[in-house]
Amino acid sequence: MACELRAVLLWGRGLQTVLRAPALAGVRRGKPVLHLQKTTVQFRGPTQSLASGISAGQLYSTQAAEDKEEESLHSIISNTEAVRGSVSKHEFQAETKKLLDIVARSLYSEKEVFIRELISNASDALEKLRHKLVCEGQVLPEMEIHLQTDAKKGTITIQDTGIGMTQEELVSNLGTIARSGSKAFLEALQNQAETSSKIIGQFGVGFYSAFMVADKVEVYSRSAAPESPGYQWLSDGSGVFEIAEASGVRPGTKIIIHLKSDCKDFASESRVQDVVTKYSNFVSFPLYLNGKRINTLQAIWMMDPKDISEFQHEEFYRYIAQAYDKPRFTLHYKTDAPLNIRSIFYVPEMKPSMFDVSRELGSSVALYSRKVLIQTKAADILPKWLRFIRGVVDSEDIPLNLSRELLQESALIRKLRDVLQQRLIKFFIDQSKKDAEKYAKFFEDYGLFMREGIVTTAEQDIKEDIAKLLRYESSALPAGQLTSLPDYASRMQAGTRNIYYLCAPNRHLAEHSPYYEAMKQKHTEVLFCYEQFDELTLLHLREFDKKKLISVETDIVVDHYKEEKFEDTSPADERLSEKETEDLMAWMRNALGSRVTNVKVTFRLDTHPAMVTVLEMGAARHFLRMQQLAKTQEERAQLLQPTLEINPRHTLIKKLCQLRESEPELAQLLVDQIYENAMIAAGLVDDPRAMVGRLNDLLVKVLEKH
């Protein structure tokens, strides 16, 4: 009955089945047991056939089957190698010895990464072979990675069918540090007392990671070049290694790790499978453990975005980024014009560290052509400022034989970079509209990269595209609410040509700045910029959407901003007379000497007694900060040529006018402090501690009156 039902079901799917009568196999536990004969399933068509998975001898019983069909195993690992000829001894390079000493003392929690590192090396060897053969138009052999555990012997073996190594390559690759990651690893540890799993996990130490768990490491390798002999490489990590010619070595590389007594758990199949699933599930080649296929092999960037689940994206992100978090944003981008592109990009959830921000780090995006790896980290596929992006780019337009040098200079790569940059910018703009709060958190964490993009990009149109991603608080909006340059421009009154901004550490200081106070009379919206590099960024941007970006400090001294626009409507008895003002300014010029270029009156201020104006103050401030020049007030004044503008209605200025004749000593202390306060408000004083003595003197003078 069951066989008949199966035939009906298969027929309903457009298939026909040829069934043979079951044969009595015998009796088990008093119940009849039947064997199904070999079954063939065929498509309805003259040339299509599909063999079913039911084999002769499979149990069919009235009880639950106790014996499952054995999964077919496939392994290339066998003990065929034998050393022949003489053995040559070599010493490790000094840096390699240091690295081996570090990994030998690594913490237990770090040790599992050796599996990831060796699988990664095997994958690289296969990629190199595939790339070579595809370029030469040759047929590809079976390209696989095999792992084998042996609990009795306490070993774990990894073997690939990749490009293999010659004797010279064994000496060079396994005796010296050639990987930049290993060099960076050593440099990162110079200032650390202990090794860190984060550092080992971040850099990786390639082949040498095997010595974290090994008493002895055997390597058998044979180059894929025709008629190449095989070799054995052997070391216990003590400082020397041996190389000898060996027979029975198949093309590729085989590594046998003899585990330390406290690392025998890595000879357990389940332990190794857990590590592979954690780190190497998306290796681009079939991965076998003790003969069983264990990895997911899908170029998901080639799939339809609708067919990929969030879980698949998370797993793939963790693999390519070697990370443990989830992607904050995911962009699956496919297009056929102007270039053929299949790509997936991820933004990490974790906030970047200072190391991640470093411009020394390259791209973390892999470049493929027709699923053949060109570069693991293609430095030129995205502009430098987008180095926080993780992902994969595949383009059929890229020739497989493109060298690293041509990759840097290729017009095709430049075009690809421009297309991807524009698409990522558009994606971030879309995300900001979709979820403003989530985007604001992203900008808080990654905004430094966008500022860098504006500063380092030469083309103005690209600068302005990146500038659409910037976010600032505004005088026209409540505290905490962010706005963009396009939004600011949309609120501008007709005929307005400038976008105004003010750089300050926080909103309170911005709103109480004398420069913002001077702008309030114009009823003009001002962007508040709080980050260290905002000023430099906007200086480089210069304009946006044909509107000039102007600091409110600069606006005060530009030619079109005439003083007569501000009329003093206060009663005459509340301000100094014109003659008193002229006399006071002359006295102040003399009292301040070379520290000021000029002293003049302003009616822009209300609550502040004075302010300093400098032509292009933002640029001047940045210059002083970067060059660390002009330590004294006189040196700074010589560079800045500041003008001190005083408010004749302010109590301090009116009192100063009286004191300059009645108490000249106190008046000098007061004018020095007014000037210093104005310089601090302008951000032109790095260390205000120098004025503490003067403040104490002023307090003493005040107390003498009481």
UniProtKB/Swiss-Prot annotation:
GO terms for biological process: negative regulation of cellular respiration; negative regulation of intrinsic apoptotic signaling pathway in response to hydrogen peroxide; translational attenuation. The modification Phosphothreonine is found at residues 176, 496. The modification N6-acetyllysine is found at residues 264, 326, 334, 426, 433, 468. ATP binds at residues 121, 160, 173, 207, 404. Residues 1-60 form a transit peptide. SMART domains: HATPase_c. NCBIfam families: PRK05218.1 (NF003555). Binds to the intracellular domain of tumor necrosis factor type 1 receptor. Binds to RB1. Interacts with SRC. Interacts with SDHA. This is Heat shock protein 75 kDa, mitochondrial.
